[in-house]
Amino acid sequence: MNPLAQPIIYSTIFTGTLITALSSHWFFTWVGLEMNMLAFIPILTKKMSPRSTEAATKYFLTQATASMILLMAILSNSMLSGQWTMTNTTNQYPSLMIMMAMAMKLGMAPFHFWVPEVTQGTPLMSGLLLLTWQKLAPISIMYQISSSLNVNLLLTLSILSIMAGSWGGLNQTQLRKILAYSSITHMGWMMAVLPYNPNMTILNLTIYIILTTTAFLLLNLNSSTTTLLLSRTWNKLTWLTPLIPSTLLSLGGLPPLTGFLPKWVIIEEFTKNNSLIIPTIMAIITLLNLYFYLRLIYSTSITLLPMSNNVKMKWQFEHTKPTPFLPTLITLTTLLLPISPFMLMIL
């Protein structure tokens, strides 16, 4: 990619997300989504290869289809209500179409087929943007229309997403696919609590971004994309050996790490609304998510593959570029739970 084009592309993505998040008019919301999508495609194809081209094509076709459904829903809603503002989305069928379009953009089940493949076909840092920044615009739309959403449909999509993300991550050796399936699971938790308490969705999104960013930065330091490469971390970057397992356990939601906080407050919110069966199902299915993280940690940190003495001394010659925000992110990933009462008080 031309270095001169990078500032333009990244500023377009930032502007598109900002327009969508701050706009209350459906047309400008749609324009922001389109800016975001078209500017992100060059990032996916930064390293030209058949795999990246395939990933960009899948991303474009999925997002374009979702945008078409969204535009159809916007036009239908404007014809029925005579309004273009997002707060007037009270008609049933346009609201259902908007939910399906946003579920497709977020990669929720049963529209999740593109997320693992696109993430696997991109570099680590492009995958980080795909699984974090690209979620902001659709979630901001869902947040603004949360009062008019169909609760039963949203809960169905959420449980399906948790099931797809938890079962899909089993038997995976590619780390990017594992993080993609984890993202699908987290989207299910976020959308499940949205009709009851939208602020909890924002809290969940914030913690999810912190955890995912930390995981991708740690993997990028070691250039680890598979389980085998991750198992060689100890002899390249010794100080990463305890940090990667703790980050993965936090992503899996193991207490007392930070990743347990969203699940804790979401289950509490469901309990306040006299709903016990749904959070129980969600929590039980999510145990599969924690299981494949535990298995990944066991195979990479506890077991030791046979290797020569020359490989064992490799850590003496490894030099990595400093990552300024990584210590702060690691601290937030593991130790944010004790200050959770203060965070909940703000919300």
UniProtKB/Swiss-Prot annotation:
Gene Ontology biological process terms in this record: mitochondrial electron transport, NADH to ubiquinone; mitochondrial respiratory chain complex I assembly
Q: What class of enzyme is it?
A: translocase
Coiled coil residues, start to end: none
Catalysed reaction(s)?
A: a ubiquinone + NADH + 5 H(+)(in) = a ubiquinol + NAD(+) + 4 H(+)(out)
Q: What InterPro entries does the record tag this protein with?
A: Complex_I_Subunit_2 (IPR050175), NADH_DH_su2_C (IPR010933), NADH_UbQ_OxRdtase_chain2 (IPR003917), ND/Mrp_TM (IPR001750)
Predominant place of localization:
mitochondrion
Keywords per UniProt:
Electron transport, Membrane, Mitochondrion, Mitochondrion inner membrane, NAD, Respiratory chain, Translocase, Transmembrane, Transmembrane helix, Transport, Ubiquinone
- Subcellular localization(s) per the UniProt record: Mitochondrion inner membrane
Any stretches that span the bilayer, and where are they?
Answer: 13-33, 60-80, 96-116, 123-143, 149-169, 178-198, 201-221, 247-267, 274-294, 326-346
| Mitochondrion in keyword set | yes
One example GO MF annotation: NADH dehydrogenase (ubiquinone) activity
Q: What does this protein do?
A: Core subunit of the mitochondrial membrane respiratory chain NADH dehydrogenase (Complex I) which catalyzes electron transfer from NADH through the respiratory chain, using ubiquinone as an electron acceptor. Essential for the catalytic activity and assembly of complex I.
The UniProt entry's sequence similarity note says: Belongs to the complex I subunit 2 family.
Q: What is this protein called?
A: NADH-ubiquinone oxidoreductase chain 2
According to its UniProt entry, this protein's organism is Pan troglodytes (Chimpanzee)
